[in-house]
Structures are given as C-alpha cells and as structure tokens.
Amino acid sequence: MKSQQLKLGLHRKNRRVWLDNRALLKGAGFQVGFKYDVKYCHLSRVIFLSLDAEGARKVAKKNGTDPIIDLNSTKVGWALGDCSEILVEYNQGIIEISPIEEKERSIHELASAFKTFEDKA
C-alpha cells in the first residue's frame, strides 16, 4: 500500500479531491479510461474508489496520457467533514480517502521530520 497526504481543495463552493499522481494511480490499477465507482461514507468519514468495469465514473486524462481523478461535489464535504488535509491510500483496485485530523497531522509531521533526521545522520 502506498499513500500520500494532500490538501482538500475548494471549487465552486464544494470540497474537491484532485488525484493526479501518475505513478500512484497506475500502481493501484487506475489507468486512463478505466471505470470505477465512488462510495461516500459519512459515518466512517471515508471515500472509497473501486475499479469496476460497470462503474459510473471513468478515469480522466491530463496531457493525453496521465490519469486524473477529480471528485468535486457536496458529497465530498459531507463524507470528509471540515478538514483541510486528507490521506489517500492506494491499494490494488481501491483508493481510500480519509481526513487527517490535527493530532494525526502532527504525528505525520513528526514522523517525517524524524525520517529526514535519520537520513541525514
């Protein structure tokens, strides 16, 4: 599993998730033109994207070949709440998007700083 931390955007008064990391998307199987479904879970505060040949959505493209997933609706804010950053976890055929709370963000920042310190030592 690979993951990345992103800012939750705002577009036309709605919360927006913009995924454009080619390596992570392709590594999870989300290729340009592949279909997928979105499940918004308000109670668990998570959004699931799952590859599905009969899916309602299609992976878009940028620059002709790079995959993009753009989620922009009131459902995004409804599911993720009022957060400023999200954690995106990429698994084969499934992407999980969840909010990063202030406490979690501090832990991630400390872990990142510690890793940087170890790398320099």
What are these regions (language model features)?
Residues 1-3, 15:
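N-terminal intrinsically disordered, low-complexity, charge/repeat-rich segments that act as generic
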Residues 9-12, 45:
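Beta-strand-rich non-transmembrane domains
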Residues 13-33, 56-83:
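Short beta-strand-centered segments at strand-helix junctions
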Residues 30-47, 78-99:
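A short beta-strand-loop micro-motif that forms or neighbors metal/cofactor-
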Residues 42-61:
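Short glycine-rich, basic-tinged beta-strand/loop micro-motifs
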Residues 55-59, 103-109:
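Short, charged/polar, Gly/Pro-enriched secondary-structure boundary elements
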Residues 110-117:
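Detector for the mature cores of small, proteolytically processed
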Residues 119-121:
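Short acidic-hydrophobic catalytic motif
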